[in-house]
């Protein structure tokens, strides 16, 4: 359906297991059917499991064939499933580790099985953002285990219902810093961890990737002295869709703004720097709507 369009459709599938490890996605798969292994001889285990589920949770699904087969499929060891995904050269990431329905069953996100899967290179990324949820703990796990940082909208209905009706709303997305717009380049970038998440106008990622987005978005468009004064008028341009929040961190005096100011999407903000001696601008700022680690802004 995307033929002749700029849209790139990438094959993928979800791999669901009881937490831990939880929900996992595999993209760039070649045959999703090979990631399902149903052994009918284990039906008694399925019956016992379904019998133990809360009735109010499964009542509307109890007669659906997919419920029974889904539980059967989940009995296949996760390591074997992910090894098949690896054989298909798929990119695999851990979904919504901080999702409330899973978190309630455990006092921590990270378990030994997750670490084992990381160490075997069977999981390559982790969602630090899912829909309206952001997890500092998942962000730290990504940094500690060098996982690709992922953010998704997890939209099950219409995007308008969840996002676009809000003022300045946008869906949570993963910005992929690929060499070009091809499936191969996108896949290479994901495996190399070259991503930044854009969530509620916040950029989240590893320092080098976030800095690349900032450098590509913001620039000094013009700088000139105001009349015969030593006040330098500086025009800062933002060519991106994000609204940047900047805080001056080098002690320079901003005369027409507080030391915290914003640069609107596709806009220009003018600031006046006092006691300037040159039109060469070297302004130190923290980017307040970006994080390169939990509670850490890039400078």
Label the predicted regions.
Residues 99:
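Glycine-rich phosphate-binding "P-loop"
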Residues 1-91, 95, 103, 127-139:
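A metal-dependent hydrolase metal-coordination microenvironment
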Residues 19-30, 102-299:
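Charged catalytic cores and adjacent phosphate/nucleic-acid-binding surfaces used
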């Amino acid at each position: 359906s995307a033929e002749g369009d700029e849209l790139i459709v990438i094959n993928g599938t979800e791999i669901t297991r009881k937490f831990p490890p939880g929900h996992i996605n595999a993209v760039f798969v070649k045959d999703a059917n090979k990631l399902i292994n149903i052994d009918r001889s284990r039906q008694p285990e399925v019956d016992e499991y379904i019998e133990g589920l809360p009735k109010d949770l499964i009542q509307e699904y109890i007669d659906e064939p997919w419920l029974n087969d889904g539980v059967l499929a989940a009995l296949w060891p996760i390591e074997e499933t992910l090894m098949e995904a690896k054989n298909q050269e798929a990119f695999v990431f851990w979904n919504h580790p901080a999702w409330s329905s899973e978190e309630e069953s455990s006092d921590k996100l990270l378990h030994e099985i997750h670490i084992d899967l990381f160490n075997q290179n069977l999981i390559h990324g982790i969602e630090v953002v899912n829909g309206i949820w952001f997890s500092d703990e998942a962000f730290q796990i990504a940094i500690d285990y060098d996982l690709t940082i992922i953010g998704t909208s997890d939209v099950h209905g219409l995007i308008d219902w969840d996002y676009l009706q809000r003022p300045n709303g946008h869906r949570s997305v993963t910005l992929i810093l690929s060499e070009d717009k091809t499936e191969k380049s996108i896949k290479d970038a994901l495996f190399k961890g070259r991503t930044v998440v854009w969530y509620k106008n916040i950029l989240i990622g590893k320092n080098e990737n976030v800095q690349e987005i900032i450098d590509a978005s913001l620039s000094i468009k013009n700088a000139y002295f105001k009349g015969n004064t030593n006040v330098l008028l500086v025009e800062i341009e933002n060519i991106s869709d994000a609204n940047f929040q900047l805080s001056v961190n080098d002690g320079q005096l901003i005369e027409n703004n507080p030391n915290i100011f914003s640069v609107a999407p596709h806009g220009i903000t003018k600031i006046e720097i006092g006691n300037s001696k040159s039109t060469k601008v070297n302004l130190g700022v923290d980017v307040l709507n970006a994080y390169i680690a939990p509670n850490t802004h890039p400078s």
